[in-house]
UniProtKB/Swiss-Prot annotation:
It comes from Synechocystis sp. (strain ATCC 27184 / PCC 6803 / Kazusa). This is Osmoprotective compounds-binding protein GgtB. The gene is ggtB. Induction: Expression is very low in cells grown in basal medium but increases significantly after a salt shock. The complex is composed of two ATP-binding proteins (GgtA), two transmembrane proteins (GgtC and GgtD) and a solute-binding protein (GgtB). Disruption phenotype: Inactivation of the gene results in loss of the ability to take up glucosylglycerol and sucrose, as well as to accumulate exogenous trehalose. Insertion causes leakage of glucosylglycerol from the cells into the medium. A lipid is attached at C19 (N-palmitoyl cysteine). Keywords: Cell membrane, Lipoprotein, Membrane, Palmitate, Signal, Sugar transport, Transport. The lineage of its organism: Bacteria, Bacillati, Cyanobacteriota, Cyanophyceae, Synechococcales. The keyword Protein transport does not apply.
Length: 421
């Protein structure tokens, strides 16, 4: 959706809403929109730059507040009658809770279905929907199904980028046979330790079971200890339960901070040759690593029938207070303009379908965006969609236990018992 088209929509909204009564928690003369979000520091500065053209075009001030306690701060604000006009959710699960409580305005009251599909592929609209109704506008995507490697080391040793899981595991065994370590894995992440392991299992589930089965798993329509989940965990174990597969073995995997685990690709000699992690790990690359020393490929398919799905995360806007200004801002966020601005600033990938790849400032980001754009199947991080007691509780801790050597069946049974009844 081009900016001039959205500008026309914004003008139309001004005319339409000027005839209406006051919006929720607002009034006709209001010239400000408030946002509560998770981006702070440098990321907050970037989103404020992306929002600036809206203020320039409309004269409406956008007040963005970034907090690192979003999941607790937002419910308190809403319950006390001080909801922000818009919230930027780091995952759609919490958004869905507010939607089901009737706290959010459906996007269909602002944009037509045609305008939505012009801006986003159906997969992203499905992820923004709650019980069939779209509520959110996606702003940023994280591409998680990536394997990082040092192309100079591959070229020097005659290694080829694997196109299938079987080829990737054959390369891993080839490295072991030469006395080398295939993988670097670090899952330590403070209070969030374990999420690296959940990402692995989710990615494998998408490659060994249908998207519908994945959705059933997330919704607990199948139990957590279902045989298909156990199969995914077993495949993960082919890497984690083999001390020769990962640098430092189990102890190294459990104790290495996730941001440090990619560093092994660039030591001399390399500590490892493969590292699976999302696009955000680029922020942890050593400053002295040149562009020709790092590359990526999508985590390969396992079962041919399920193709090459991509596991994603992302940030999504939804509207609490139905004011003319908030409607205009939601329309702007669905246009290509804020995404184009953000793309040029780096450390960002847009889920919007109309973003020129040449806007991204570096080769790696363009490649990540291209992988996302080509994906026929995308699914959101499962742990972010599950109840907190599981997704950020027993699923995380279960991965720590499993990597440490616990029996996989027992781990899955423990997680299943923890699911809220």
């Amino acid at each position: 959706m081009k900016f001039f088209k959205i500008t026309t929509l914004i003008i139309s909204l001004i005319v339409l809403t000027s005839c209406q009564g006051p919006g929720v928690n607002g009034d006709e003369d209001r010239k400000q929109v408030t946002i509560l979000g998770v981006m702070i520091g440098e990321q907050q500065e970037k989103i404020e730059q992306a929002l600036a053209p809206f203020t320039e075009a409309t004269g409406i001030e956008v007040v963005y507040e970034g907090v690192d306690t979003f999941a607790t701060t937002l419910p308190i604000r809403v319950d006390s009658g001080r909801a922000p006009d818009l919230a930027m959710f780091p995952q759609p699960g919490l958004m869905a809770d507010f939607a089901r409580e009737g706290k959010l305005v459906p996007l269909g009251e602002i944009l037509t279905p045609e305008e939505m599909t012009e801006a986003y592929d159906q997969a992203w609209l499905d992820l923004a929907a709650v019980d069939g109704t779209v509520y959110g506008v996606w702003y940023r995507a994280s591409v998680k199904s990536l394997v990082w490697f040092n192309p100079q080391e591959f070229a020097a040793n005659g290694y080829e980028v694997p196109g299938t899981w079987e080829e990737m595991m054959a390369l891993s065994q080839r490295l072991i046979d030469k006395g080398k370590t295939p993988w670097c894995l670090g899952i330590e992440s403070g209070n969030a330790t374990g999420w690296v392991g959940t990402d692995w299992v989710e990615d494998i589930m998408l490659r060994t079971a249908s998207p519908a089965t994945y959705d059933q798993w997330v919704a607990h329509d199948i139990p957590f200890n279902d045989r298909r989940v156990e199969n995914a965990l077993d495949i993960f174990g082919e890497i984690t339960q083999n001390e020769k597969m990962i640098y430092g073995g189990k102890v190294g995997a459990l104790s290495t901070p996730f941001g440090d685990s990619i560093l092994g690709l660039f030591t001399d000699p390399p500590h490892c040759y493969l590292h699976r992690q999302g696009n955000f790990i680029a922020a942890f690359l050593p400053a002295d690593v040149d562009d020709d020393q790092v590359d990526i490929f999508p985590l390969p398919p396992i079962e041919e029938e399920y193709g090459l799905p991509i596991l994603v995360a992302g940030d999504i806007f939804a509207m609490f207070n139905d004011t003319p200004e908030a409607r205009q801002l939601m329309a702007y966020l669905a246009s290509s303009r804020p995404h184009e601005v953000a793309a040029t600033l780096g450390a960002y990938i847009s889920p919007h379908k109309n973003i020129d790849l040449n806007l991204y400032p570096d080769r790696l980001t363009r490649k990540q965006a291209e992988i996302l754009n080509k994906a026929e199947v995308i699914r959101f991080d499962a742990s972010d969609m599950m109840p907190g007691a599981v997704g950020t509780g027993t699923f995380w801790s279960g991965m720590v236990d499993y990597i440490g050597g616990a029996d996989g069946t027992q781990v899955l049974n423990t997680i299943e018992r923890s699911w809220p009844r």
